[in-house]
Amino acid sequence: MEAEESSSSVVPLPQDVQSVVRGGFRCLLCGVNIPNRPSLTDHLSGRRHVRLHEERDKRNQQQERSVYVSNFPRETSEEQLRDVFQKISPVRNIVMDKDRGLYAIVEFESKDGMCAALEEPQIKLSGKRLRVKPREKKEFQRKKGGSPRTLQPPDPEALSKELLNCADVEQQIKKLVSLCSPSHHESHLRELLLSLLQETFTEFFPGCQLLPFGSSVNGFEISGCDLDLYLDLGDDEAENVEGKAEKEIQNREESSTDMEVSMEDPETERKEEEMEIGNSKNDEDEDVTPGLSLKGLSSEEILEVVGKVLRHCVPGVHGVQSVPTARRPVIHFQHKTSGLRGDVTLNNRLALRNSSFLRLCSDLDARVPQLVYTVRYWARVNQLAGNPFGGGPLLNNYALTLLVFFFLQTRNPPVLPTLVHLREETANEVPQVIDGWDCSFPSDPAQVKESGNQQSLSSLLSEFFSFYASLDLHLLILCPCNGLTIPLPFSSPPPAWSEGFRLGPLNIQDPFELSHNVCGNVSSRAARRFISHCAAAARICRTPNYNLHSTSHPWGITPILLPPPTERECVGRGGTEISIPLGGVSPEKTYAAVSKVFVDVLLCTLEEGREDSCQEGKALELSTKHAKAQCKVEKNEVGGELGEQEVPCKAEQNNTKEASKQKSIFKTEEGMTESARRKREMTEPCMSDMTNGKKRRLEFTRGIWDHHLATSAMEEEMCGEAHKDSKTKIDYSNNGTAQWELLVWHRVWEGRRKERRRKQKGEADGVELEIAVSQALALEKEDKCDGPLMKLILTAQLTVKESLQLYLTPKFDPQGLSSTFFHFLESYLPRMVAQIQGCGDPV
């Protein structure tokens, strides 16, 4: 009865929302997944959903009161069509096919006007009968980014070919800067467009100034970058705009969708865009005339007026879209002839000062822009930055630039001085205060002393990636103003600016507006990807190929700048990373637990990294008393010192050393504890049921397993002394990084829950149960292959914040099994390690 009442009280889902099989909901309108009901309620009332809902309703209403008109002379004007249809019913808007003049969309004030036009038997223009039919109703879709612009930096493939011909890494970086910088022709186009816009705005707003900022002027201009413009309307108008805007900004919450608007492709969607722009008001009835007075208007109204001037009075400008809800209200536009895109803001004097500061830093040391260009391109290729709509969860170019600045400030000696140091050096400068923030710094680079740092570009780039891979960024605020970090949470009392500072997974304080987190929009996933890609790039920079010139394969910065392979290009090639918390346990014991899971539980084989599969230096060195005792047992029989994880896996090794291996196992078996014997007895019935085809492979696995059972037996007998005097350590000379080859022999991750339920009826528990499950699954699965199913590269890195970071990358995966194996490991491995260490619940 209670179930019936609860089911009847469930609120029905809106038509735009559907339930997801695995739980949660999906908003079809916004294209996002929502985990639960409270989040769904928040989403439905959120700005993005409401905006799209209103936009869809508006589009549907347009379609219902519009007709499609064709068969008119090519020279027909909009006014002529308006005169014809105005006689039938009041016309709201007309959009014509200006390119070819083949059709027009006529929108009436009401649906009755559309019906009246369709009922007219004959509608003529200049004696020619017009074809009038209902407008085709298209399903509403969220706007997506338009087609790529012709003005773009080189693609990674073309760039890599150019970089291969360079002599060293420094030349590669300089070549990258040269290829990404805009050409003289593009720079000239920007100047012409700026002049055209200035001339137009001056006509309508006498005394105004149009000032460029951002990448166009800060020394880090890239081909195809947007033209950022600040429209200064004069003292009176600026005070009117900025005073009201600041109040709105204080009450406006930043979000990743603040500027999430689209710039539609002009050739395919321009007609629909123009219809939308004109839907709210008839622009013909609201003339935009020169000499406008903006006094008394709100910031949104002024933004709307400026948008109309752009839309109707600047030749070649289209796709004009106002975003009054952004942190800094902005107008996006495109210029068809030049292919440039631009943004106009009305209250962004702080951005002008920011751009001047970036320009100063760019001029102080030639290495600064070269590193910024390289890091920006790296982030773009790896999809870490470059939000296509101005907002979004990724890093922006300004944030990347500040990351480079902060890194250069922390070198010894610093490559760049901090802003605080610059102010101390030039105390005689006139103070610059904008919106209450101190924006003072030297105006002339000659006033600043040269840096004493003589590091090469290749060294600095390598250190950049290692630096950020080693930081726990979610627990720090990076402050480029003074070159320091602030640990989180704030100490008491917190700094004055902390009240408005929006904390997130990545925190970079704006050097001037101290309460602004430049990375406030960055999502947790984007922050994690940034750190993992930094770690991957750092590993590449530590390989010999980084500084070793080659004409046959990528070297230097080329491997860093190549995009990762897509899923279509190589199924299962994508790797994964798994974090194992140390939890107060030593790194050596944590690694031993990880090894036990892979080898004992999952029946895999671990081999030390070799030169062909590990170019990054030394592997983990195991030299405990435990290992020495084990080596004494096996020294003569096996013919070499077999460490804990050094297990032979090749067929010839199996054949030549089988007798000695069995002898070794026999010797150590006498020292087994009762616990180890129980492990052995659990698997013997399974072994007796093997078929001949499986026996060879599983006998080898059994040999490995018996070898480690004997090892664990010795551990139990020696646990006190062995751990007390342990010398096991990770080789920190390679930044605490080690690498092995992991061979996967059996698909023991498939059907594991079912088999575990079956085995739980017995006496086995914990790790013993998991081993029994794997043995049973290995017998059941028919993996008909002579070699391993997969070969993976396992990299372990000890992080600063008490965790062991594991990276698994497929090396050989013909069946594409690695993706499902990785998915299984992401939750299974940390839980099993915690259980082995005695601080976790059974799996």
UniProtKB/Swiss-Prot annotation:
Which compartments is it annotated to reside in? Answer: Nucleus, Nucleolus; Nucleus speckle
- The Matrin-type zinc-finger regions cover 25-55
Give start-end positions of Basic and acidic residues composition bias: 241-255, 658-670
Comp. bias regions, Basic residues: 134-146
Please list the residues that bind ATP: S215, N354
The cofactor required is: Mg(2+); Mn(2+)
Residues recorded as binding Mg(2+), renumbered to this chain, are D226, D228
Residue numbers spanned by region KA1: 564-837
Q: Which GO terms describe its molecular function?
A: ATP binding; enzyme-substrate adaptor activity; mRNA 3'-UTR binding; poly(A) RNA polymerase activity; RNA binding; RNA uridylyltransferase activity; zinc ion binding
Checking SMART domains in the record gives:
RRM
Summarize subunit and interaction data from the UniProt record for this chain. Associates with the cleavage and polyadenylation specificity factor (CPSF) complex.
| Full protein name | Speckle targeted PIP5K1A-regulated poly(A) polymerase
